Amino acid sequence: MAVMIWGSGTTNGRGPRYTEAALSDARLPAVLRTTRQAVRSGDLSGAYRQFILNGVRRSFSTKWFAAVDDRDVGCARALILDSRVLHSLNALGWSSWQAAGTRRWPTRYATYVSSMHGWASSLGVTADWLEWLLFHLNGRVDGPREGQDST
């Protein structure tokens, strides 16, 4: 599970335990196979719904989706959705459950991906660059305060 090693960070110490839980889960081969197929067919909601493994949550399952999505760039390719990206989106006033019209995470994830690709297109950037920016900001999206130089 390279995406778990990639995204575990160095501060919380839970990465090895969660990675071991995922690697020990008997469902692992089938989950990786079926979710890869769902992602490659453009069914991101279905992939999200099917990705159930011990020790793996949204941040890592969506990293898997982004890693295996090799569709043409014209498609709304899978993006990573982790807590840092969510902090930034929420700080900007965007709510996945309101945008999706449901609290069901598979639909919310697909709505997030679609929204990000739409915003990226209108801004003239790629969706993965926009995702990186939101990750980097981690919710710190305030502009300059009154009286501060913005340069």
Q: What is each residue range found by the language model?
A:
Residues M1-G13, K63-A67, E131-F135:
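Short, hydrophobic/amphipathic alpha-helical patches that form generic packing surfaces
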Residues M1-V56:
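Helix-hairpin-helix/helix-loop-helix acidic hairpins
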Residues T35-V39, V68, L92:
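Alpha-helix boundary/capping residues
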Residues L44-Y48, V68, A99:
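A near-ubiquitous, low-amplitude feature marking generic local secondary-structure context
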Residues S59-T62, D69-T151:
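C-terminal accessory module of base-excision DNA glycosylases/AP lyases that mediates lesion recognition
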